[in-house]
Design a protein with these regions (language model features):
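A conserved beta-strand-loop-helix scaffold within acyl/acetyltransferase catalytic domains
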Residues: 2-20, 24-113, 123, 128-130
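Hydrophobic transmembrane alpha-helix bundles
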Residues: 13-17, 67-77, 91-102, 119, ...
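Active-site/acyl-donor-binding loops of N-acyltransferases
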Residues: 1-7, 132, 136-216
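Glycine/small-residue-rich hydrophobic helix-like segments
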Residues: 97-159
Length: 216
């Protein structure tokens, strides 16, 4: 999913403009130094994960996460702050390359999403890069979600003009993994993604199906 054209809020329907402007009234978004917000970043991350289904909710070690922030030096990090309380409600980090920006992560407190935090975060990023979009530069939100049940890419497409850039999926298995996949492939429909193991197996089967469909 990519954004390779300038963003124009005036081209949106009135309802979508309202949602974006609502978020701007409630939150300030700016680039931050993550080392100055370790505790808040961890709190936002954990609040966001609590809203995920347990079957693929990650387990996060607080100390390891806070220490990992030391390695964010080459990332561009945005923070979304509540205008009333000044509390960090969302963060996003991205990595910039010569021809594109990798939209890696966006995490938000669920109770802030109703007030438009996600829209405000995305708009702030688009506005910062708007002059470069369409000039051999684009924002990449990554591949289609397989394991994670999310409508975020649909949201980016509908509200912000992102588009699907189709590509071919190729998978290189280790020999023993390939043997397992081949063995369980005929029984793939019995694997239900209702726990962590089932979710992983179901995801592999979905990717294998994508590969087979492209070959036919």
């Amino acid at each position: 999913m990519i954004k390779d054209t300038p963003f124009d809020i005036n081209a949106l329907k009135a309802k979508r403009r309202y949602e974006i402007n609502k978020g701007k009234k409630n939150f300030d978004v700016k680039r931050i130094r993550p080392s100055e917000h370790r505790d808040e970043l961890y709190e936002v991350l954990m609040a966001a994960y609590q809203g995920w289904p347990e079957k693929y909710r990650p387990t996060v070690n607080e100390e390891k996460f806070k220490n990992s922030i030391n390695s964010w030096g080459d990332l561009i990090v945005y923070g979304g702050f509540d205008k009333v309380e000044g509390k960090l409600c969302a963060f996003s980090y991205l990595k910039e390359y010569p021809n594109y920006l990798e939209f890696s992560v966006l995490r938000a407190r669920p109770d802030s999403e109703r007030s438009g935090i996600n829209a405000t975060m995305v708009v702030a990023i688009l506005e910062d890069y708007n002059e470069r979009l369409g000039k051999a530069f684009y924002i990449n939100d990554g591949e289609r979600a397989i394991r994670h049940e999310t409508a975020f890419q649909d949201y980016l497409e509908k509200y912000f003009g992102f588009r699907k850039a189709y590509c071919r999926l190729n998978i290189q298995y280790q020999w023993w993994v390939k043997a397992i996949v081949k063995t369980i492939w005929p029984f793939r429909k019995i694997f239900v993604a209702n726990n962590k193991i089932g979710s992983i197996i179901s995801s592999v089967m979905k990717m294998e199906e994508c590969c087979k469909n492209k070959q036919n």
